[in-house]
């Protein structure tokens, strides 16, 4: 892949979306993970200014992620704001009858979405997405949470390709070396949740996408079963609500 051309195409896409919407710029959630770090870097290259980052940790968020996010803001000279969302989450815990880790993780993602759109309106800017193709195909995200955005420049790149582009753009090694995590609860790991590494997941997704039967026969049947199950079960997350036509 020609990463220079891909970078230029992504930057053009960001510029076009902001211009066509008559917005001032973009707002993004900066978690300290590689996906949002890459999007922030692309936004800075594309827009130079009017890139606003929200850092929204909870009490159990990995402190190293916040430090990495702050370092990136300094390196890119980004305007940012830290909003601790634990008090909002605590209010939910007091009222809700469903306080499983998954439920709390989903609610935290929706708190962040609400804040992003609030600042989007305040700054006349677009919320830019940070989900990669692997996550989108699997529905590995919170509907109306981290999946919510006005547009997404990296949604056509598999997670393994995100790492390649991040290296090409010289992102700090901390982003590249850390284990993938949505940081929804303490010690949460994407690959542990999914049961396979992203390298294997992407290999399976590509084989399914191209219907490469020869490759599919060589892959772990449990991997393919997991991928098909998640893709089928979570298809609704990538669609607008269906409206009955009268």
Curated annotation (Swiss-Prot):
GO terms for molecular function: ATP binding; glutaminase activity; metal ion binding; NAD+ synthase (glutamine-hydrolyzing) activity; NAD+ synthase activity. It comes from the Bacteria. Pathway: Cofactor biosynthesis; NAD(+) biosynthesis; NAD(+) from deamido-NAD(+) (ammonia route): step 1/1. Transmembrane segments: none annotated. One of its GO terms (biological process) is NAD biosynthetic process. Its EC number is 6.3.1.5. Keywords: ATP-binding, Ligase, Magnesium, Metal-binding, NAD, Nucleotide-binding. ATP binds at residues 29-36, 130, 159, 181. It catalyses: deamido-NAD(+) + NH4(+) + ATP = AMP + diphosphate + NAD(+) + H(+). NCBIfam families: nadE, PRK13980.1. PANTHER family: GLUTAMINE-DEPENDENT NAD(+) SYNTHETASE, NH 3 /GLUTAMINE-DEPENDENT NAD + SYNTHETASE. Homodimer. Belongs to the NAD synthetase family. Catalyzes the ATP-dependent amidation of deamido-NAD to form NAD. Uses ammonia as a nitrogen source. This is NH(3)-dependent NAD(+) synthetase. It comes from Campylobacter jejuni subsp. jejuni serotype O:6 (strain 81116 / NCTC 11828). The lineage of its organism: Bacteria, Pseudomonadati, Campylobacterota, Epsilonproteobacteria, Campylobacterales. The gene is nadE.
């Amino acid at each position: 892949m020609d990463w220079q051309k891909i970078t230029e195409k992504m930057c053009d896409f960001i510029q076009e979306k902001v211009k066509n919407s008559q917005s001032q710029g973009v707002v993004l959630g900066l978690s300290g993970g590689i996906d949002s770090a890459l999007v922030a870097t692309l936004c800075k290259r594309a827009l130079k200014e009017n890139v606003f980052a929200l850092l929204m940790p909870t009490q159990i968020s990995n402190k190293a992620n916040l430090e990495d996010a702050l370092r990136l803001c300094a390196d890119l000279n980004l305007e940012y704001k830290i909003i601790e969302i634990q008090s909002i989450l605590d209010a939910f815990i007091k009222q809700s009858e469903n306080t499983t880790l998954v439920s709390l993780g989903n609610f935290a993602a929706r708190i962040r979405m609400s804040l992003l759109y609030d600042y989007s309106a305040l700054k006349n800017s677009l919320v830019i997405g940070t989900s990669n193709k692997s996550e989108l195909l699997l529905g590995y995200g919170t509907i109306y949470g981290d999946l919510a955005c006005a547009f997404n420049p990296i949604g056509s790149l598999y997670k393994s390709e995100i790492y390649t582009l991040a290296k090409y753009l010289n992102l700090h090694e901390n982003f590249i070396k850390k284990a993938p995590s949505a940081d929804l609860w303490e010690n949460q790991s994407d690959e542990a949740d999914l049961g396979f590494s992203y390298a294997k997941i992407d290999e399976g997704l590509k084989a399914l996408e191209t219907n490469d039967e020869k490759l599919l026969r060589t892959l772990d049947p449990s991997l393919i079963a997991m991928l098909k199950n998640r893709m089928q079960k979570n298809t609704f997350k990538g669609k607008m609500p269906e409206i009955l036509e009268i």
